[in-house]
């Protein structure tokens, strides 16, 4: 009796064991399926404009744009205009005479401004810096410093650092990086782990140039945000270069009694200002 009972129990246990293994295998397969199909669809959710505020500032326009991918929200502050009505210039702040971007814009009689390029703790510039035709710091070869924004004969331009060599006729320049948008396309391989305030300079379709900040996004997210087709009424962004970010990120625009302000948290070495061009008498 005991032997028969023992054998009977064994016959029941073995099928149960296999059923459990089968269920565990099925659950594992289902997890793999979810990872394959659902997670990528969440990760690649498209960013869309959910709110836009505009301010006409004479020869330029300013925007405060809120975007979302369904799970995260970022806010863009940007000023944009069309040269030659709008002039870009780099303001050197090596003597610390300006404590913030608002002061730099106001005292320079500019329309708008953002912080400029990278710098050391003692405010020594990192990368090429040219202000008012004077080379403050020379070009550097470094992976991070992949682009140069410069102005020659009041015409702004953005190029890869390896394609830049001649400073003749350049009035203003900032070397920084990485590129965020190139030829209307996002840049692959950008960091997608660290979210922080960002500053950038950009070219939009139709020859419109601008500068702005984003609070707050990873470099990869900002690259995706800047190629949103209806981000700007002037047309999509064609090219964009990342400037110094984090605590340096600051934006200010004033038009009469109206202003848009998102201040930085530290003293910076340089500013990129947008000013009305001097009209001939």
Give residue spans per PLM region.
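Sec-dependent signal peptide recognition
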Residues: 13, 30-36
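Short acidic-glycine loop/turn motifs at beta-strand connectors
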Residues: 69, 83, 150-155, 182-183, ...
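Zymogen propeptides
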Residues: 44-140, 212
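Short polybasic linear motifs
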Residues: 23-24
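Active-site-adjacent helix-turn-beta-strand microarchitecture at beta-sheet edges
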Residues: 119-192
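N-terminal signal peptide c-region/cleavage motif recognized by signal peptidases
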Residues: 40-42
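Positively charged N-terminal leader segments that act as targeting/secretion signals
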Residues: 7-17
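Conserved, well-ordered active-site substructure
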Residues: 123-143, 191-242, 247-281
């Amino acid at each position: 009796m005991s032997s028969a009972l023992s054998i009977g129990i064994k016959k029941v246990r073995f099928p149960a064991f296999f059923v459990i293994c089968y269920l565990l295998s099925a659950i594992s397969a289902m997890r793999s399926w979810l990872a394959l199909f659902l997670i990528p669809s969440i990760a690649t959710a498209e960013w869309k404009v959910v709110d836009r505020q505009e301010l006409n500032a004479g020869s330029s326009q300013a925007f405060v744009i809120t975007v979302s991918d369904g799970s995260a929200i970022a806010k863009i502050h940007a000023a944009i205009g069309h040269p030659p009505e709008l002039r870009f210039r780099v303001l050197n702040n090596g003597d610390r005479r300006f404590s913030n971007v608002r002061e730099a814009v106001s005292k320079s009689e500019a329309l708008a401004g953002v912080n400029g390029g990278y710098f050391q703790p003692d405010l020594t510039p990192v990368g090429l810096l040219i202000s008012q035709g004077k080379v403050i710091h020379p070009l550097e070869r470094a992976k991070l410093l992949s682009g140069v924004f410069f102005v020659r004969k009041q015409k702004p331009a953005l190029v890869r650092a390896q394609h830049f060599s001649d400073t003749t006729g350049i009035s203003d320049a900032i070397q920084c990086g990485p590129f965020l948008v190139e030829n209307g396309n996002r840049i692959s391989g950008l960091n997608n782990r660290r979210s922080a305030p960002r500053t950038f300079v950009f070219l939009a379709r139709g020859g419109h140039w601008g500068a702005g900040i984003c609070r707050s996004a990873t470099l990869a997210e900002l690259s995706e945000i800047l190629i949103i087709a209806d981000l700007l009424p002037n047309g999509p962004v064609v090219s964009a270069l990342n400037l110094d970010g984090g605590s340096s990120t600051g934006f200010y625009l004033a038009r009469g009694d109206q202003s848009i302000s998102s201040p930085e948290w530290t003293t910076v070495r340089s500013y990129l200002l947008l000013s009305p061009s001097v009209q001939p008498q």
